[in-house]
């Protein structure tokens, strides 16, 4: 039996989105304090940097949320239930990231974004948070190289 979709803009939706935003901020703050961060190599050419920013800040978050939360989480939910789906997609999302600290951060963010998708019934709120995260990381990388 398919679970009914939640109302997209009702109070429950905005409460779930606000909760996810708070969790996102907490995970990001803890990661900044506890995980040693590597800086990504960014292109020097302004046009290439603009393409990288567009891909990292818009395209990848939308595609990743559609895949991990829209496809993987929903498939796992049908197979094993919502708790296993949340954990499973977070593991897969975390493993898809580079270094061990990135994998740990990816896992934690996968839990937050997956919970957001579960509570709101939509992937776009998570895509918005994911995009904000990637823009913050990109800004940190640029600041780290003195731009």
Predicted segment positions?
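Hydrophobic alpha-helical transmembrane segments
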Residues: 14-21, 50-54, 83-88, 103-107, ...
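Active-site His/Glu-centered metal-binding helix of metallohydrolases
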Residues: 62-67, 71-72, 99, 128, ...
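Small-polar-interrupted transmembrane alpha-helices in polytopic inner-membrane proteins
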Residues: 82-97, 131
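Functionally important transmembrane alpha-helices
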Residues: 90, 102-147
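Membrane-interface helix/loop boundary segments of multi-pass membrane proteins
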Residues: 66-88, 115-122
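Short, amphipathic, aromatic/basic-enriched membrane-interface segments that mark the entry/exit
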Residues: 58-59, 70-80, 94-101
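Juxtamembrane helix-loop-helix connectors linking adjacent transmembrane helices
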Residues: 2-60, 74-78, 147
């Amino acid at each position: 039996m398919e679970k009914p979709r939640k109302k997209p803009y009702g109070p429950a939706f905005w409460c779930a989105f606000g909760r996810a935003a708070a969790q996102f901020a907490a995970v990001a703050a803890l990661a900044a304090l506890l995980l040693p961060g590597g800086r990504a190599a960014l292109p020097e050419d302004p046009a290439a940097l603009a393409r990288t920013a567009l891909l990292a800040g818009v395209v990848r978050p939308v595609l990743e949320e559609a895949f991990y939360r829209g496809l993987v989480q929903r498939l796992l939910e049908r197979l094993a239930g919502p708790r296993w789906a949340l954990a499973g997609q977070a593991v897969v999302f975390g493993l898809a990231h580079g270094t061990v600290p990135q994998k740990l951060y990816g896992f934690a963010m996968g839990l937050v974004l997956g919970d957001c998708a579960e509570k709101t019934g939509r992937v776009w709120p998570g895509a918005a948070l994911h995009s904000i995260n990637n823009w913050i990381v990109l800004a940190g990388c640029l600041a780290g190289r003195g731009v």
